[in-house]
Design a protein with these regions (language model features):
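Nucleotide-activated donor-binding/catalytic signature segment of Leloir-type glycosyltransferases, i.e.
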Residues: 256-281, 288
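N-terminal subdomain of nucleotide-sugar transferases
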Residues: 1-64, 234-239
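Conserved donor-binding/catalytic core segment of Leloir-type glycosyltransferases
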Residues: 2-4, 176, 208-227, 232-236, ...
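A charged, aromatic-enriched C-terminal amphipathic alpha-helix characteristic of glycosyltransferases
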Residues: 343, 354-389
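Acidic donor-binding loop of glycosyltransferase active sites
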Residues: 283-301, 316
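Donor nucleotide-sugar binding/catalytic pocket of nucleotide-sugar-dependent glycosyltransferases
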Residues: 27, 31, 158, 162-206
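Membrane-proximal helix-turn-helix segments that form the acceptor-binding/catalytic region
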Residues: 33-37, 97-104, 123, 127, ...
Length: 395
């Protein structure tokens, strides 16, 4: 199997973070590595990974102009990282050509697995012979990429990008989706697809234990307005208990605004952008984990926040709004905020504050057990491989 993904080897995380001016997506990289390791655990076949670094363009978003070709390995996994001149359009074209060149070195009967609707990858497989079977793992609808970019020019570019992506996506034979609602906007049609909300990876053997003080609420992820952070900050202003703290970790458009809030309220702690492992350790130290994303906007029903799975695996209680993309089987293990308002968020936080440490630990442990048993990467990738093999035998 050949896997195409915009990822970076885990040991290079600090190097990539240091060169990036706007942070990187820990969630996407972690998802891809869970996918790769889950497949590796379920098959004896060799795994080939062709990757491109998920970084912004030079010089505005990344410090390096020329990204080098690099061969790497991780156990029995062989990787080929395609380099490029890191400037718009040229970057995508070079990556497409290099990915296509690598694919032609492998047998035509190879099974290809593409992570996300990344244009250079779809472009590279578009003209491949039918013997190559292509499965696309789609975690986001292309129309909702870069939603924080609101200029007319950026909107025009996004529309053009979507048209090209959907044109090339016709070559995809089957899909892995995070929610069943995604099938319609992706124009899946009669092509087979499997719904896989997400997965969790390696976690510590023992769940964390609550500490009485302070009562800390943690958010880790992108610091963008569409994720409900303004509402969370407003709720914190309405919480007057001096022993309640709000911890924030990540990077994004609201970073400076959050620094200003933290300067005014000592209960708000901003940790900046942390490597994934440090963010996970911080999750285990928090009292509760919060996802303030509301159910507003069409994109919510097309996404299953990977943050939810990661939060639950940490063993801490999870406080969030009910989202259309999250199946009902998760309901017993999540604390839902009844209304999408700062007041309702405040009230939910106060109700959790009244629980004893042992009650909070029990809530977190039940959610942790659920995802570790039913949604771990080995179980989820076994489902994916069974789905692919079934489609192969039916073809």
């Amino acid at each position: 199997m050949i896997i195409l993904g915009p990822l970076f080897p885990e040991e290079r995380e600090q190097e990539i973070i240091s060169a990036s001016k706007r942070g990187v997506s820990n969630a996407a990289n972690n998802f891809q590595w869970n996918l790769i390791k889950g497949i590796h655990a379920n098959t004896d076949e060799p795994l080939i990974v062709i990757n491109a670094l998920p970084v912004g363009t030079w010089p505005k978003n990344f410090k390096t102009f020329r990204l080098k070709d690099t061969d790497w390995s991780c156990g029995n996994i062989v990787g080929h990282e395609v380099g490029c001149w890191n400037i718009p359009l040229v970057k995508q074209f070079i990556r497409m050509r290099k990915v296509r060149a690598w694919l032609k070195k492998y047998p035509r009967e190879s099974e290809l697995l593409i992570f996300t609707a990344y244009l250079p990858f779809l472009w590279a497989v578009n003209k491949l012979k039918p013997e190559y079977r292509v499965t696309a793992v789609i975690t986001d609808i292309p129309e909702f990429y870069d939603m924080h970019q609101v200029s007319a020019f950026r909107s025009l570019l996004r529309r053009i990008h979507c048209k090209i992506v959907y044109h090339f996506m016709v070559r995809v034979d089957r899909f892995i989706l995070l929610t069943k609602q995604m099938a319609v906007p992706l124009h899946v049609g009669n092509r087979p697809y499997l719904v896989m909300e997400g997965m969790c990876g390696d976690v510590a053997d023992e769940p964390p234990v609550s500490k009485p003080q302070p009562f800390s609420m943690l958010y880790t992820g992108r610091l963008n307005r569409r994720y409900g952070l303004e509402l969370l900050l407003q709720a914190m202003k309405e919480l007057h208990d001096p022993d309640i703290e709000l911890w924030l970790c990540g990077s994004g458009e609201m970073e400076e605004e959050i620094r200003a809030y933290a300067a005014q309220d000592s209960r708000i702690r901003f940790f900046g952008f942390l490597p994934h492992e440090e963010a996970v350790q911080l999750q285990k130290k928090a009292t509760v984990l919060v996802n303030p994303r509301t159910n507003q906007g069409e994109y919510t029903k097309y996404s299953f926040p990977s943050k939810t799975m990661e939060y639950m695996a940490s063993g801490r209680p999870v406080m969030m709004f009910r989202l259309d993309g999250i199946p009902g089987e998760y309901d017993p293990f999540l604390t839902y905020i009844p209304e999408e308002s700062a007041a309702s968020s405040r009230d939910t936080a106060e109700s959790l504050r009244k629980l004893s440490p042992s009650e909070l630990d029990e809530m977190g442990a039940r959610g942790r057990e659920f995802v570790l048993k039913n949604k771990n990467r080995n179980v989820q990738m076994r489902r994916v491989l069974d789905f692919i093999h079934k489609e192969q035998s039916d073809a």
